[in-house]
């Protein structure tokens, strides 16, 4: 079982979404990014998750020196199909594994997701991008 699979149901059970996990060399830093459907992540949210995960990681005998829990930030990564659905109409920066029309990097508006294919409006052109071809996708913050 992966660490993501271990933590996701616990975090979901507390009313949050596990966005991402970053690990440095084994046994060092474990960084967990959380979000929630309504509102912003607060310091109290991070403390509650951190306290709960500390106990879970101890029980599961997961070795780490430092645990950090935070929000994913304004430029939130988009990883799952549900992320793209949730942020339809928002602007995103997309990097592909395999080039599309000779290009791997795109900036555009998320239009829709059907059958694991994302439609992105990039400079007025509607691009069809298979989700499995995404290397990286992040929201572009509204300032």
Swiss-Prot record:
Q: Which InterPro entries match?
A: Ribosome_maturation_RimP, RimP_C, RimP_C_sf, RimP_N, RimP_N_sf
GO CC annotation, single: cytosol
BP GO terms, sorted: ribosomal small subunit assembly; translation
Asked whether the UniProt record includes Cytoplasm among its keywords, one would answer: yes
Looking up Gene3D superfamilies in the UniProt record yields:
Ribosome maturation factor RimP, C-terminal domain (2.30.30.180), RimP-like superfamily, N-terminal (3.30.300.70)
Q: Which Pfam families match?
A: DUF150_C (PF17384), RimP_N (PF02576)
Q: Does the keyword field hold Chloroplast?
A: no
Superkingdom of this protein's organism? Bacteria
Q: What is its main location?
A: cytoplasm
Q: Which UniProt keywords apply?
A: Cytoplasm, Ribosome biogenesis
Location of the protein in the cell:
Cytoplasm
**Similarity comment:** Belongs to the RimP family.
Any idea what job this protein has? Required for maturation of 30S ribosomal subunits.
Q: What is this protein called?
A: Ribosome maturation factor RimP
Q: Which organism is it from?
A: Nitrosomonas europaea (strain ATCC 19718 / CIP 103999 / KCTC 2705 / NBRC 14298)
Taxon lineage:
Bacteria, Pseudomonadati, Pseudomonadota, Betaproteobacteria, Nitrosomonadales
């Amino acid at each position: 079982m992966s660490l993501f699979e271990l933590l996701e149901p616990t975090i979901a059970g507390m009313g949050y979404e596990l966005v991402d996990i970053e690990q440095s060399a084994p046994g060092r830093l474990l960084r967990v990014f959380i979000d929630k459907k309504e509102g912003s992540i607060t310091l109290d949210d991070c403390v509650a998750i951190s306290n709960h995960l500390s106990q879970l990681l101890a029980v599961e005998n997961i070795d780490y020196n430092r645990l950090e829990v935070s929000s994913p930030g304004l430029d939130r990564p988009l990883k799952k199909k549900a992320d793209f659905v949730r942020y339809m109409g928002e602007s995103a920066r997309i990097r592909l594994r395999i080039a599309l029309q000779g290009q791997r990097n795109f900036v555009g508006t998320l239009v829709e997701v059907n059958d694991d294919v994302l439609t992105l409006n990039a400079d007025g052109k509607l691009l069809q991008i298979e989700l499995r071809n995404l290397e990286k996708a992040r929201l572009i913050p509204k300032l």
